[in-house]
Amino acid sequence: MCFRFLDKCMGLIRMILIRLKNSDRISIGSGFSLRKGVIFRIKKTGRIIIGNNVFFNNYCTLSSIGEITIGNDCIFGEGVRIYDHNHRYCCSNIPIYEQGYKVKPVIIGDNCWIGSNVVILPGATIGDNSVIGAGVVVYGRIPEDSVVKNIQELQIDKIERGSYSAH
């Protein structure tokens, strides 16, 4: 019981710190909650807009140089990463870190469930009422009322019994 109380207190403290540090670059609706290790990285030109009743599970990261918009009633599994920018890499004679960034907004509609370890890349738009399965890398436009999942098959090979010879 004591741990639940402390966990709720820590969540409130994290929300207060977010609002104090980035109040001009972040907008958070009512009913917002998050667990431990959630990081919002917002550069001077960045902005994050979060609707009402949004929940972030442990260790999610949002990184903004442009704009990330999240609708109402969204839930995020553990380890979700959202980026509105990527490194430029046009000139082989210039180090990548000196070439700046390509920035495209990210938009997540209302009532979306983003599964654990999803990566959302610059320019992605996820329509309302969509579910993104665990481990998916999202880019481009996902229509509303969609379910997106990885189609990966496990390859299971048999280990043969017998003797082993190193030569």
Predicted features along the sequence, with ranges:
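Extended, small-residue-rich solenoid/repeat segments and analogous flexible loops
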Residues: 1-39
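Flexible, glycine/small-residue-enriched loop-and-beta-strand segment within the central core
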Residues: 17, 35-50, 55-124, 151-153, ...
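Sparse recognition of residues in long alpha-helices and their boundaries
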Residues: 70, 128, 145-146
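Short-chain dehydrogenase/reductase
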Residues: 75, 113, 131, 137, ...
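Beta-rich strand-turn-strand
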Residues: 116-131, 136-140
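Acidic, glycine-centered active-site loop in nucleotide-sugar glycosyltransferases
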Residues: 143-144, 150-152
